[in-house]
């Protein structure tokens, strides 16, 4: 049962959204609060012929629809200092925007204990991959 709709939350220049398009996702929405990032994402969508929508907004606050999949590589830290408020904002948005049977994937540095914080928002949290300095955390609303 392949997910249909995908949200890149905090898309930056759109790397994850473009990669998702290359994997066959057709309904892609990318959002960020940085104008330069949104401009770069729009250009990358055009260059790679991604059929997607790029929307300005703060952690998905302007979105109402729910998505089958959410991908996020959030700026949770500066150096080794972790921004707990920003982490909570992205997790709250993901919980609100994720379809009941959907899954969200977060790319984070290994030293960020996202798994622990995510359990406050999602009944199912697990690390699905690790490479170098990064790990991939999957969360879902179904336990």
List each model region and its residues:
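Short beta->alpha hinge that forms the Motif I/post-I loop of the SAM-binding pocket
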Residues: 32-34, 86, 109-110
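A short glycine-rich, Lys/Arg-flanked "PGG" loop and its adjoining helix->strand segment in the class I
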Residues: 88-100
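A short SAM/SAH-binding and catalytic strip from SAM-dependent methyltransferases
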Residues: 71-81
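Short hydrophobic/aromatic-enriched beta-strand-loop microsegments
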Residues: 54, 124-130
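Conserved SAM/SAH cofactor-binding pocket of Class I
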Residues: 1-66, 72
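Conserved class I S-adenosyl-L-methionine
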Residues: 109-122
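Conserved beta-strand signature within the Rossmann-like core of class I S-adenosyl-L-methionine
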Residues: 101-107
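Core SAM-dependent methyltransferase catalytic element
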Residues: 130-143
């Amino acid at each position: 049962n392949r997910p249909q709709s995908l949200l890149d939350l905090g898309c930056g220049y759109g790397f994850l959204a473009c990669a998702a398009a290359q994997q066959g996702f057709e309904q892609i929405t990318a959002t960020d609060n940085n104008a330069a990032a949104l401009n770069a994402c729009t250009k990358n969508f055009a260059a790679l012929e991604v059929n997607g929508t790029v929307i300005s907004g703060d952690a998905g606050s302007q979105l109402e629809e729910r998505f089958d999949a959410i991908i996020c590589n959030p700026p949770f830290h500066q150096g080794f200092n972790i921004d707990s408020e920003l982490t909570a904002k992205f997790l709250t948005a993901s919980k609100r925007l994720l379809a009941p049977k959907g899954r969200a994937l977060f790319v984070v540095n290994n030293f960020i204990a996202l798994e622990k914080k995510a359990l406050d928002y999602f009944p199912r949290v697990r690390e699905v991959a690790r490479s170098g300095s990064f790990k991939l955390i999957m969360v879902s609303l179904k336990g």
